[in-house]
């Protein structure tokens, strides 16, 4: 059975693909950001003793590999092709390292690793909170009994509307869950679009 691209399949299939893309983006982003910032800082700080040049070159090559990984992820989640970048052989020694450092595409790959990280943090947080929050609020009536009860433990409904009714508390949280789940598909789609457009803008020859 042919696989349906995430960007063109049924809503549920596309939603799972986009949610997986966003949630997997943070751990990958942490690793990529660490490589980019650490390698760049170490390379620049040691340029005076020449060891910085191969460190920078190695960092840029690693950035290129990580950028290709993101290109594959973007192509998979959008269902649109995203050509990989295959740099020519840089050569060995100082000449090869210098050739890598002079390659503009390598620097764009590195910039993407750094710039994309804050967005990955935001999209991960919003996607996780919106999805799990919606499920948790919808099922509030099944676990609200475990919350501390008493004069010093006021629920959101009581704080907002001065209503301590348990029915009102359950009703408010259930409606909140319905609203979150009713809007989760467009929210996830918007977050995915923001992240993939940034990738296409920095990792391809033309913006999406």
Tell me what each language-model feature is.
Residues 15-40, 73, 97-131, 137-142, ...:
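Short, structured motif recognition centered on aromatic/hydrophobic residues
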